[in-house]
Amino acid sequence: MARIAGVNIPTNKRVVIALQYIHGIGKKFAQEIVDKVGIPAERRVNQLTDAEVLQIRETIDRDYQVEGDLRREVSMNIKRLMDLGCYRGLRHRRSLPVRGQRTHTNARTRKGPAKSIAGKKK
């Protein structure tokens, strides 16, 4: 198993697919990385040489923000919104949907399990 950006990527998959196991790399960035390094699209991870793995690792470290750094940046952005006290920050603080979805019904994923109300029966 090749270890790139602190993630063990599966060896039997194509490189483009395997790179998507890294947080912050999707289809587009995986294809970009493979094109930059010059690896054929059908090549599998177990067929990569150590030099190619090193090239991939260096490309990701140099050009992309992945894993812990990306998670940290996202959480800092949310924290900044909450500290500002803007509408989006208040919605995050109250664990409600941020992007304008309705909350009278639905929004259970964001709000958590429904709280039962005593005496409310039909």
Swiss-Prot record:
Record-linked InterPro entries: Rbsml_uS13_C (IPR027437), Ribosomal_uS13 (IPR001892), Ribosomal_uS13-like_H2TH (IPR010979), Ribosomal_uS13_bac-type (IPR019980), Ribosomal_uS13_CS (IPR018269)
Oligomer and partners: Part of the 30S ribosomal subunit. Forms a loose heterodimer with protein S19. Forms two bridges to the 50S subunit in the 70S ribosome.
KW Ribosomal protein (keyword) present: yes
Function: Located at the top of the head of the 30S subunit, it contacts several helices of the 16S rRNA. In the 70S ribosome it contacts the 23S rRNA (bridge B1a) and protein L5 of the 50S subunit (bridge B1b), connecting the 2 subunits; these bridges are implicated in subunit movement. Contacts the tRNAs in the A and P-sites.
Family to which this protein belongs: Belongs to the universal ribosomal protein uS13 family.
Gene3D superfamilies for the chain: 1.10.8.50, 30s ribosomal protein s13, domain 2 (4.10.910.10)
Gene: rpsM
Name of this chain's protein: Small ribosomal subunit protein uS13
Pfam families per the UniProt record, alphabetical: Ribosomal_S13
Domain of life from the UniProt record: Bacteria
GO cellular component: cytosol; small ribosomal subunit
